[in-house]
């Protein structure tokens, strides 16, 4: 009897660890109510706005070349539309990091789910996100290289500056001023 109680206690403890260790989120659904910039949106979920940062991409900043065009491209895909967000994590600013999916209405075919993060990179409106110089997602890097090769979007500018370099230079100018 003691052995069975001990085994059940261990099983319950293991289950509790799994429940606690598993993220409380997996996905969220809602309507996009605001476009912050080319890689950040507000999604209305249960009447509450949730700030979502598109994971694995880095779009130009608002005041950077192509920043407004990236914001407009994202708005064209998702503004006032219902989306599904596959949540990956939360960043240091409290934003949900995730992959955003939207159904695209195509003539003569049923709606097709579209990975908005990938579409932004493929259209040349964002870079594949880098961590310590390496792309976080190899597929995003492939899409970036394809867009670069076709010179679409920001790749039409031969002097396009990566957002992480632009932010660093912008911070340096602010510190000097």
UniProtKB/Swiss-Prot annotation:
Residues 1-26 form the signal peptide. Keywords: DNA-binding, Endonuclease, Exonuclease, Hydrolase, Nuclease, Plasmid, Plasmid partition, Secreted, Signal. Its EC number is 3.1.-.-, 3.1.12.-. Transmembrane segments: none annotated. Residues 27-157 form the TNase-like domain. Disruption phenotype: Loss of plasmid stability and partitioning. One of its GO terms (molecular function) is DNA binding. Coiled coil: none annotated. The active site is at 53, 61, 95. Gene3D superfamilies: 2.40.50.90. Pfam families: SNase (PF00565). It is found in: Secreted. One of its GO terms (cellular component) is extracellular region. It is an enzyme of class 3 (hydrolase). Its cofactor is Ca(2+). Its main location: secreted. The N-terminus is blocked. Monomer. PANTHER family: EBNA2 BINDING PROTEIN P100, SERINE_THREONINE-PROTEIN KINASE 31. Involved in plasmid partition. An endonuclease that acts on supercoiled dsDNA, converting it first to open circular DNA and then linearizing it. Preferentially cleaves regions in dsDNA that are capable of forming ssDNA, such as AT-rich regions and sequences that can form cruciforms. Has poor endonucleolytic activity on linear DNA, has 5'-3' exonuclease activity on dsDNA cleaving generating 3'-phosphonucleotides. Plasmids IncP-alpha RK2 and IncP-alpha RP4 are identical. This is Protein ParB. It comes from Escherichia coli. The lineage of its organism: Bacteria, Pseudomonadati, Pseudomonadota, Gammaproteobacteria, Enterobacterales.
């Amino acid at each position: 009897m003691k052995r069975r109680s001990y085994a059940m206690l261990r099983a319950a403890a293991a289950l509790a660890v799994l429940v606690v260790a598993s993220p409380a989120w997996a996905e969220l659904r809602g309507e996009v109510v605001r476009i912050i910039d080319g890689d950040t949106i507000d999604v209305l979920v249960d009447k509450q706005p949730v700030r979502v940062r598109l994971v694995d991409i880095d779009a130009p900043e608002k005041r950077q070349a192509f920043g407004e065009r990236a914001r407009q491209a994202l708005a064209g895909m998702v503004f006032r539309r219902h989306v599904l967000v596959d949540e990956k994590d939360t960043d240091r600013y409290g934003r949900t990091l995730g992959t955003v999916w939207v159904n695209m209405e195509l003539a003569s075919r049923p709606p097709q789910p579209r990975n908005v993060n990938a579409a932004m990179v493929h259209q040349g409106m964002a870079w594949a996100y880098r961590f310590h110089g390496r792309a976080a997602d190899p597929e995003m890097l492939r899409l970036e290289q394809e867009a670069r090769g076709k010179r679409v979007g920001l790749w039409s500018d031969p002097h396009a500056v990566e957002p992480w370099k632009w932010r660093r230079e912008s911070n340096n100018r602010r510190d000097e001023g």
